[in-house]
């Protein structure tokens, strides 16, 4: 019986240590979420403005530009998948990978060859385990992205988009990331970056009315200059939203783990007390039985 009590004490001690770790990770994630949300909010005005500028140039001028031209028969697509480097974030990476698989299946059914670009070690492990290749991998800083990484990814994707499909280029670029809605809601999301879906002036609502610009030297050169900046800004915004979503998921996962640890400690404590009570009862029973035996003798 004493050995059983020692086992329960060891379990209580180890679970208590784990609970402290979970609590520390929860507090770290909580403290970083605020900054991550602020970065998402700060990136939105620029991303929206450059998208509107590109739409304005394209809708107000009859320009046959690779940025907005829909290929007649697209045969190749690039898919950028944003996951996390670390675990302990609930179903965050699993959800975005499930969304990516749905997109890959749809593109395959449309007869398109797909080049996969991967961000985060979780997605890397997912594809490596299944023996499925990917075009390029980026790891590190998934929970604290930097603009330089977005520019690097954007440069690779733009080069692929501007390259002829016969030479390994692509006709479309899609991004799969986690959209940060609130601390309790994050949605896996798919966005087609290129070709850009332009809002035509006739179809624009009062809120979507596009501004009029004059371009020097001409609108086509403006689009050439905007293409890499547009891609970079959209990718960076997606990375920031993914980072905020990862931290929110980790905070919830660590809180849940801490609550479960507390529940386990209560259960082990109850079992230990029951075992101690049974041990005391057994000892008393043996003492009484021994005393009775002495008296009867």
From Swiss-Prot:
Provide the Gene Ontology terms for cellular component: plasma membrane; proton-transporting ATP synthase complex
Gene3D superfamilies attached here? 3.40.1380.10, ATP synthase, gamma subunit, helix hairpin domain
InterPro entries for the chain: ATP_synth_F1_ATPase_gsu, ATP_synth_F1_gsu, ATP_synth_F1_gsu_CS
Question: What protein name applies here?
Answer: ATP synthase gamma chain
Q: Give an example GO molecular function.
A: ATP binding
Q: What family name appears in the similarity comment?
A: Belongs to the ATPase gamma chain family.
For this protein, the record's PROSITE patterns field holds: ATPASE_GAMMA (PS00153)
Q: Which organism is it from?
A: Micrococcus luteus (strain ATCC 4698 / DSM 20030 / JCM 1464 / CCM 169 / CCUG 5858 / IAM 1056 / NBRC 3333 / NCIMB 9278 / NCTC 2665 / VKM Ac-2230)
As recorded in UniProt, coiled-coil segments are none
Compartments, record wording: Cell membrane
Q: Which superkingdom does the taxonomy of this entry point to?
A: Bacteria
Q: Topology versus the membrane, per the UniProt entry?
A: Peripheral membrane protein
Protein task = Produces ATP from ADP in the presence of a proton gradient across the membrane. The gamma chain is believed to be important in regulating ATPase activity and the flow of protons through the CF(0) complex.
**Species classification:** Bacteria, Bacillati, Actinomycetota, Actinomycetes, Micrococcales
Q: Which GO terms describe its biological process?
A: proton motive force-driven plasma membrane ATP synthesis
Record note on quaternary structure: F-type ATPases have 2 components, CF(1) - the catalytic core - and CF(0) - the membrane proton channel. CF(1) has five subunits: alpha(3), beta(3), gamma(1), delta(1), epsilon(1). CF(0) has three main subunits: a, b and c.
Record's Pfam families? ATP-synt
Keyword annotations for this protein, in alphabetical order, are: ATP synthesis, Cell membrane, CF(1), Hydrogen ion transport, Ion transport, Membrane, Transport
Question: Which HAMAP family does the record match to this protein?
Answer: ATP_synth_gamma_bact
């Amino acid at each position: 019986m004493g050995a059983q009590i020692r086992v329960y004490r060891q379990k209580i001690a180890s679970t208590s240590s784990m609970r402290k770790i979970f609590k520390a990770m929860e507090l770290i994630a909580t403290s970083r979420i605020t900054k991550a949300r602020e970065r998402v909010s700060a990136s939105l005005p620029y991303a929206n403005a450059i998208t509107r500028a590109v739409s304005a140039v394209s809708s107000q001028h009859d320009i046959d530009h690779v940025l907005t031209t829909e290929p007649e028969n697209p045969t190749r697509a690039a898919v950028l998948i944003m996951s996390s480097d670390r675990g302990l974030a609930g179903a965050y990476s699993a959800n975005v990978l499930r969304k990516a698989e749905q997109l890959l299946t749809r593109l395959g059914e449309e007869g398109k060859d797909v080049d996969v670009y991967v961000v985060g070690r979780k997605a890397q492990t997912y594809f490596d385990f299944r023996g499925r290749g990917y075009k390029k991998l980026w790891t590190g800083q998934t929970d604290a992205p930097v603009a330089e990484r977005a520019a690097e990814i954007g440069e690779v994707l733009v080069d692929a988009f501007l390259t002829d499909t016969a030479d390994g280029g692509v006709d479309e670029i899609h991004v799969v990331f986690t959209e940060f809605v609130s601390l309790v809601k994050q949605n896996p999301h798919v966005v087609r970056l290129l070709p850009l879906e332009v809002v035509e002036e006739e179809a624009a609502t009062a809120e979507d009315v596009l501004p009029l610009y004059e371009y020097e030297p001409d609108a086509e050169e403006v689009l050439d200059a905007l293409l890499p900046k547009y891609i970079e800004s959209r990718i960076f915004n997606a990375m920031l939203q993914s980072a905020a979503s990862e931290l929110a998921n980790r905070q919830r996962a660590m809180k849940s783990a801490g609550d479960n640890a507390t529940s386990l400690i209560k259960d082990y404590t109850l079992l230990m007390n029951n075992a101690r009570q049974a041990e005391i009862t057994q000892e008393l029973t043996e003492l009484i039985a021994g005393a009775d035996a002495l008296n009867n003798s």
